[in-house]
Amino acid sequence: MVSKLTSLQQELLSALLSSGVTKEVLVQALEELLPSPNFGVKLETLPLSPGSGAEPDTKPVFHTLTNGHAKGRLSGDEGSEDGDDYDTPPILKELQALNTEEAAEQRAEVDRMLSEDPWRAAKMIKGYMQQHNIPQREVVDVTGLNQSHLSQHLNKGTPMKTQKRAALYTWYVRKQREILRQFNQTVQSSGNMTDKSSQDQLLFLFPEFSQQSHGPGQSDDACSEPTNKKMRRNRFKWGPASQQILYQAYDRQKNPSKEEREALVEECNRAECLQRGVSPSKAHGLGSNLVTEVRVYNWFANRRKEEAFRQKLAMDAYSSNQTHSLNPLLSHGSPHHQPSSSPPNKLSGVRYSQQGNNEITSSSTISHHGNSAMVTSQSVLQQVSPASLDPGHNLLSPDGKMISVSGGGLPPVSTLTNIHSLSHHNPQQSQNLIMTPLSGVMAIAQSLNTSQAQSVPVINSVAGSLAALQPVQFSQQLHSPHQQPLMQQSPGSHMAQQPFMAAVTQLQNSHMYAHKQEPPQYSHTSRFPSAMVVTDTSSISTLTNMSSSKQCPLQAW
């Protein structure tokens, strides 16, 4: 007779025989173990199974479990040898109590799976659970297995004791038959429906009580224990096929109408049926996984809430980053960043506006150490009409904010007056200077026409609060070696003997826009800060003529 044992079982028997155990001793040991009630499964006559022993015509289920249990211990299964740490699950007790033909078929199927590779069986069960969206919690509730151990066994092939695998395989076999009956429910006519199909209908309507119906001859004690614990209803879980359909619909319409939701219900149920390998006409067999219009509505509502929450988080993060980036500028002052609350005489840069898109920003910093002064120019003037400047306002940008640029405070007025006359003019020229707002240029020019040049510097401020400052004589050149006086940048100028006008000419040549033929228009004068003009008395007439024709860009400090 050809042996029905697997190669591993044959190796185990060979190892037992080679260890000195005789056939008679082995058979006697098996007979002593068979009546043991430890596993709660009685001896029953079953068809020949792969785990059969020496007697091929009569094979009890318990003998199969015993052989598998021994094999599990040798392969490193967890738990004690006698299985006292794991009570017999109700599902095995039900299998013991059933005497129907269906129960015999289930036991035979469990025996076949126990004789196969555990990892192969685990992958098959995992794939079936994913196909039908069955959660592991349902398996845990029915079999009593530890969910962590079950997850490791299904995902990584962690060894599991044979008794536990028998409970898992029993659940798998029964679940297959249960789902098959659900999809075939409407095939049977209501007139010819038998008692068994009536019980199946009850199980379909109440899937949380998915316990196998008991035979008529079964005692009440056998079925009392499984019904004591109420099974939890399976929570609805969206399948991957339905989620793909819903996300595509969400991209098209975030709040679909009722008709659109009903169309999505049909499409999702069809996809779920195709995923399970059944006809879409049997969508009722999905049971707790049946997609309804209410579930589709809730899904879209949850997606909209999630999207709104993510947008709020993004806005909060952006606002927080903006606040953190502004805090160092507002709370920490530095020599290169003056606070906006500084008085006008501490500001070292002025920004003006000009009509058109072409804009040039200007800032000029002057720092002085001890008795020496050094000019550091960064650049860059916009064209400003003298008539556009109003002496009645502070140094403001067009948007009404104080401008803070790199550099220290302004040097004394006498220092400003001598910037353009260093080492090129005698001290007599530097004393015939006038410092006045732009609005007072015309008035001073008219007064100069009727009187001789003033020999004392004149300082005309906005509020009249500036005290007269005596001019300071500079006996040494204040420019740094890498900087040249502005006068040297305009060779051949007819105003070479007038230092300030030479600087004005240079700025006019470098910053006037050639393509601007018409006179530029400027913003309201109230938006521009007050500016002081420093020049000598001999040049005031020329400056007046240039300002009246709006062709002179003026430099402000």
From Swiss-Prot:
Domain named POU-specific atypical: residues: 93-188
SUPFAM superfamilies: Dimerization cofactor of HNF-1 alpha, Homeodomain-like, lambda repressor-like DNA-binding domains
Pfam families referenced in this protein's UniProt entry, alphabetically: HNF-1_N (PF04814), HNF-1B_C (PF04812)
GO molecular function terms listed in the Swiss-Prot or TrEMBL record: DNA binding; DNA-binding transcription factor activity; DNA-binding transcription factor activity, RNA polymerase II-specific; identical protein binding; promoter-specific chromatin binding; protein homodimerization activity; RNA polymerase II cis-regulatory region sequence-specific DNA binding; transcription coregulator binding
Region (Disordered): 64-85, 324-352
GO cellular component, one term: nucleus
Domain HNF-p1 as annotated: residue spans: 1-32
Keywords tagged on the record: Activator, Diabetes mellitus, Disease variant, DNA-binding, Homeobox, Nucleus, Phosphoprotein, Transcription, Transcription regulation
GO biological process: one example: regulation of Wnt signaling pathway
DNA-binding region: 231-311
Modified positions (Phosphoserine) in chain numbering: 49, 52, 75, 80
Positions of disulphide bridges: none
Subcellular location as annotated: Nucleus
CDD domains registered for this protein in UniProt: homeodomain (cd00086)
Stretches for region Dimerization: 1-31
InterPro entries from the UniProt entry: HD, HNF-1, HNF-1_N, HNF-1_POU, HNF1_dimer_N_dom_sf, HNF1b_C, HNF_P1, Homeodomain-like_sf
Source organism, top-level taxon: Eukaryota
Major location (coarse): nucleus
Skewed-composition ranges (Low complexity): 328-344
Subunit and partners: Binds DNA as a dimer. Can form homodimer or heterodimer with HNF1-alpha. Interacts (via HNF-p1 domain) with PCBD1; the interaction increases its transactivation activity.
Function: Transcription factor that binds to the inverted palindrome 5'-GTTAATNATTAAC-3'. Binds to the FPC element in the cAMP regulatory unit of the PLAU gene. Transcriptional activity is increased by coactivator PCBD1.
Disease: Renal cysts and diabetes syndrome: An autosomal dominant disorder comprising non-diabetic renal disease resulting from abnormal renal development, and diabetes, which in some cases occurs earlier than age 25 years and is thus consistent with a diagnosis of maturity-onset diabetes of the young (MODY5). The renal disease is highly variable and includes renal cysts, glomerular tufts, aberrant nephrogenesis, primitive tubules, irregular collecting systems, oligomeganephronia, enlarged renal pelves, abnormal calyces, small kidney, single kidney, horseshoe kidney, and hyperuricemic nephropathy.
Family that this chain belongs to: Belongs to the HNF1 homeobox family.
Protein name per UniProt: Hepatocyte nuclear factor 1-beta
Organism whose genome encodes this protein: Homo sapiens (Human)
Gene field: HNF1B
